[in-house]
Curated annotation (Swiss-Prot):
UniProt-recorded name of the protein: Disease resistance protein RPS2
Higher taxonomy: Eukaryota, Viridiplantae, Streptophyta, Embryophyta, Tracheophyta
Effect caused by changing residue 439 to N: In strain: cv. BG-4, cv. KNO2, cv. Po-1, cv. Wu-0 and cv. Zu-0
Family recorded in the similarity comment: Belongs to the disease resistance NB-LRR family.
InterPro entries (alphabetical): AAA+_ATPase (IPR003593), Apaf_helical (IPR042197), LRR_dom_sf (IPR032675), LRR_R13L4/SHOC2-like (IPR055414), NB-ARC (IPR002182), P-loop_NTPase (IPR027417), Plant_NBS-LRR (IPR050905), WH-like_DNA-bd_sf (IPR036388)
Physiological role: Disease resistance (R) protein that specifically recognizes the AvrRpt2 type III effector avirulence protein from Pseudomonas syringae. Resistance proteins guard the plant against pathogens that contain an appropriate avirulence protein via an indirect interaction with this avirulence protein. That triggers a defense system including the hypersensitive response, which restricts the pathogen growth. Acts via its interaction with RIN4, and probably triggers the plant resistance when RIN4 is degraded by AvrRpt2.
GO annotations of cellular component type: cytoplasm; plasma membrane
SUPFAM superfamilies attached to this UniProt entry: L domain-like (SSF52058), P-loop containing nucleoside triphosphate hydrolases (SSF52540)
Result of changing residue 566 to L: In 206C; abolishes disease resistance to AvrRpt2
Entry superkingdom: Eukaryota
Effect seen on changing residue 190 to S: In R2M4b; no effect. In R2M4c; abolishes disease resistance to AvrRpt2. Does not display a dominant negative effect
Variant or mutagenesis effect after changing residue 188 to L: In R2M4; abolishes disease resistance to AvrRpt2. Does not display a dominant negative effect
LRR repeat locations: 512-533, 534-556, 559-580, 582-604, 605-627
Length: 909
């Protein structure tokens, strides 16, 4: 039995071994086939890799680079290739050992089985990589488009803007569209190029980075071509825009892209071009530059950044970098002239670069003197300035109408860096005939609208105040160049304001001129005989040394429309003014005239007569005004007050009265001065005039206890400026009971002077809806007034002046102020001036502080011990305090570490 059992076991072992040998031989056969398949597959994968690498290298020459997806695929191929190479080495080593002894076969069989499984895994990976390669080939091209690095000139002074833009382009920022705007030549393209290069050199999170250089002629079809070319797309020239848009959309929809559009002139419908609109889900961005903030709005820019002019320091650095010759600028005389040239550029980079290059080889002081003189008088003649002007002309030509272009050119009549009152500017435009009343449209509002267009086009800037505008130096030079037919007819304009002239230009220089502006000089005399057949505009205002106008001065100015003699020292008007039969606008405000000549009535087309602040004006004959049937504006604020002094003598003309004004059918704006209570009572009787009163000065109305302002001024709806002086019995102003929340809605300036019995300003409380347009309040010599708490929530109040009010104890009464800090307190206040307020204890209750005040002037207010500002940890937007040094040093400090905080800037006065 043992023998049989042993035999059975032995047979079973032999049979089992035979079966294992057969299985091992099968594995060996499968492994060899798998190795062959692996070698073929890896070879094919290498070929695909080599083709892709070649394409990347070729596209790299065009400024393109490998996409993140392609880069990951190439990395995976390299890993797979390494694994394959190692496995093939192991297989070949095993093949060399196949002749070894039989006892190793079982071991080899096990190892071959494991090796076969690894081969299968690698083959599977290779298959997946091949599938991914197909997706990469059709995914907007095998490589993704990027901007190539753009060579740019040195960048000066835009570091802060760079940081702002890069922050916007960061992953955390959800807003998708940024509009960068500013005037031509200010550096928008340079900023965009710097951003482009920064992203390329330091890396970014976008799959696709596309730069498109726009122009005025670019349409949506052209944008499609530019974007399509950058994406590597191709299409037939006859293919429709819709099909092209679809291709672009398919190429971009799964990508995170950044589209950079430089110099956009017209609104672009991104979706119509096929570019997906950026949103917080796709995290894409579109950034564009333009010269118009209006276009930023039309394009849906969620973030708008204005590229500002360079500060003086950076402007000097840029200019010097173009001159190159440091030794040249070390000469004090040449440096002084260079600084004049730089100042004329007004921080405009293009002008600085152009003029710096033009002066680089000028070594003598005489050359620099000549350059500064030419730049002052005829800047277009400076080398390179024609290029600067050509760039600005694009913006000029792009204005929507000839009306806008005329209004723009008119702004050049004022001095460099001069802030122009918007309302005054619009009044000139009306006088010139640019604006006319039609269909009930208010011409002043229309003028504001046009100024908004010019500001949006970056051709005008906001002035020193919100109510003002100004024109950049270089833009002004360009405007004068355009006004003279691009320098061809210089004799058409004689514009020399603020030049320091003591003599007027010679008579022959006036003959061909259409426009003459000699304002703000020191001219003492004018030519005796002038023939100006084409002259339409003459500005002589602010020549304080001018005391007389020659008798026949106006005889030969037959088409003159605008004449401004304001703030000269003239004492009389020559009778030759009667020849100005085309005159529309006449300003003699601030002059020393005492009589209006009767001949003024001959100016039948006159619409605007400004005589405000002519305090010496005593006589206005009826015939000087009554014949002016087209008169719309008559301003006698702080002026003539002889309303009830009509004379009927044989040798004396009857004087102007209130009744005469009612016959001026076109009158819309009236400025009135009243110097007696009787006159004030008389004015109350002429109800038809009340709606026209916009400027009112009341003085010396003694026995007037309460001033019923609403009854006099049509509930105050149109009153814009109110001045009350030396009405010693006045206690307060009466406000309408039936207009609790809507009285004096147009009032902008309030002046109260020498009202010794005034205990409060208004008869009832002031809500936020009242006085909603008041900008400036001046109160002086009102010795019974305790506070001005009513001013605290006026939404547009910018300036408060309190002078010599002996009993004022606080600006805001403690019991009339909110119990906690209120952000609506003084929401717009910028300037506070106080002087000679001996009882003033505090400017604000201790729990409050000014948030937006920029200037505080305190003189002789000894009881004030604390500034109404919070200490700040940064120097940004610190207010300036003008005060006595002794008072400044005595200020109370609440915290022992206050010296670590930034206090307001101190300026001794």
């Amino acid at each position: 039995m043992d023998f049989i059992s042993s035999l059975i076991v032995g047979c079973a072992q032999v049979l089992c071994e035979s079966m294992n040998m057969a299985e091992r031989r099968g594995h060996k056969t499968d492994l060899r086939q798998a190795i062959t398949d692996l070698e073929t597959a890896i070879g094919d994968l290498k070929a695909i890799r080599d083709d892709l690498t070649l394409r990347i290298q070729q596209d790299g020459l065009e400024g393109r680079s490998c996409s993140n997806r392609a880069r990951e695929w190439l990395s995976a191929v390299q890993v797979t290739e390494t694994k394959t190479a190692l496995l093939l080495v192991r297989f070949r080593r095993r093949e060399q050992r196949t002749r070894m002894r039989r006892r190793y076969l079982s071991c080899f069989g096990c190892a071959d089985y494991k090796l076969c499984k690894k081969v299968s895994a690698i083959l599977k990976s290779i298959g997946e990589l091949r599938e991914r390669s197909e997706a990469i080939k059709t995914d907007g091209g095998s490589i993704q488009v990027t901007c190539r690095e753009i060579p740019i000139k040195s960048v000066v002074g835009n570091t802060t803007m760079m940081e702002q833009v890069l922050e916007f382009l960061s992953e955390e920022e959800e807003r998708g569209i940024i509009g960068v705007y500013g005037p031509g030549g200010v550096g928008k393209t340079t900023l965009m190029q710097s951003i482009n290069n920064e992203l390329i050199t330091k890396g970014h999170q976008y799959d696709v980075l596309i730069w498109v250089q726009m122009s005025r002629e670019f349409g949506e079809c052209t944008i499609q071509q530019a974007v399509g070319a950058r994406l590597g797309l191709s299409w037939d020239e006859k293919e429709t825009g819709e099909n092209r848009a679809l291709k672009i959309y398919r190429a971009l929809r799964q990508k995170r892209f950044l589209l950079l559009l430089d110099d956009v002139w017209e609104e672009i419908d991104l979706e119509k071009t096929g570019v997906p609109r950026p949103d917080r889900e796709n995290k894409c961005k579109v950034m564009f530059t333009t010269r118009s903030i209006a276009l930023c709005n039309n394009m849906g820019a969620e973030y708008k950044l204005r590229v500002e002019f360079l500060e003086k320091k950076h402007a000097w650095e840029l200019f010097c970098s173009k001159v190159w010759r440091k030794d040249l600028l070390e000469s004090s005389s040449i440096r002084r002239l260079a600084e004049i040239i730089v100042s004329k550029c007004g921080g405009l980079p293009l002008a600085l670069i152009t003029l710096g290059g033009a002066m680089a080889h000028r070594e003598t002081e005489e050359e620099w003197i000549h350059a500064s003189e030419v730049l002052t008088r005829f800047p277009a003649e400076m080398k390179g300035m024609n290029y600067v002007f050509a760039l600005l002309k694009f913006s000029y030509d792009n204005l929507e109408s000839d009306l806008l272009r005329s209004c723009f050119l008119y702004c050049a009549l004022f001095p460099e860096e001069h802030s122009i009152e918007i309302e005054q500017l619009v009044e000139y435009w009306v006088g010139e005939g640019f604006l006319t009343s039609s269909h009930g449209v208010n011409t002043i509002y229309k003028g504001y609208f046009l100024i908004g267009d010019l500001k949006a086009a970056c051709l005008l800037e906001t002035g020193d105040e919100k109510t003002q505008v100004k024109m950049h130096n270089v833009v002004r030079s360009f405007a004068l160049w355009m006004a003279s037919e691009q320098g061809t007819y210089k004799e058409l304009i004689l514009v020399e304001p603020s030049m320091g002239h003591t003599e007027a230009p010679k008579a022959e220089n006036w003959r061909q001129a259409l426009v003459i502006s000699l304002l703000d000089n020191r001219i003492q005399t004018l030519p005796e005989k002038l023939i100006c057949p084409k002259l339409t505009t003459l500005m002589l205002q602010q020549n304080s040394s001018l005391k007389k106008i020659p008798t026949g001065f106006f005889m030969h100015m037959p088409v003159l429309r605008v004449l401004d003699l304001s703030f000269t020292s003239i004492t009389e008007i020559p009778l030759s003014i009667k020849y100005l039969v085309e005159l529309y606008h006449l300003s003699m405000s601030g002059t020393k005239i005492s009589v209006l000549p009767q001949e003024l009535g001959n100016l039948r087309k006159l619409k605007h007569l400004d005589l405000q602040r002519t305090q010496f004006l005593q006589t206005i004959p009826r015939d000087a005004i009554c014949w002016l049937s087209k008169l719309e504006v008559l301003n006698l604020y702080y002026s003539y007050a002889g309303w009830e002094l009509q004379s009927f003598g044989e040798d004396e003309a009857e004087e102007l009265g209130f009744a005469d004004l009612e016959y001026l059918e076109n009158l819309t704006t009236l400025g009135i001065t009243v110097l007696s209570l009787e006159t004030l009572k008389t004015l109350f009787e002429f109800g038809a005039l009340h709606k026209h009163i916009q400027h009112l000065h009341v003085e010396e109305c003694n026995e007037l206890l309460y001033f019923n302002l609403p009854s006099l001024t049509n509930h105050g709806r149109n009153l814009r400026r109110l001045s009350i002086k030396s009405c010693h019995d006045l206690e307060y102003l009466v406000t309408p009971a039936d207009f609790e929340n809507d009285w004096l809605p147009s009032l902008e300036v309030l002046t109260l002077h020498s009202l010794h019995n005034l205990t409060r300003v208004w008869g009832n409380s002031v809500s936020q809806d009242c006085l909603r347009n008041i900008r400036c309040i001046n109160i002086s010599h009102c010795n019974k007034l305790k506070n001005v708490s009513w001013v605290q929530k006026l939404p547009k109040l910018e300036v408060i002046e309190l002078f010599d009010c002996r009993e004022i104890e606080e600006l805001i009464s403690e019991h009339e102020s909110p119990s906690v800090e209120d952000p609506t307190l003084f929401p717009s206040l910028k300037t506070l001036r106080t002087r000679d307020l001996p009882e003033l204890n505090s400017i604000l209750p201790s729990r409050f502080s000014f948030q937006k005040v920029e200037t505080l002037v305190i003189t002789n207010c000894p009881r004030v011990k604390k500034l109404p500002f919070q200490e700040r940890r940064t120097q940004m937007n610190l207010p300036t305090v003008y005060c006595e040094e002794k008072w400044w040093k005595a200020l109370e400090k609440d915290q022992p570490n206050e010296e670590l905080c930034y206090l307001p800037r101190f300026v001794p006065n």
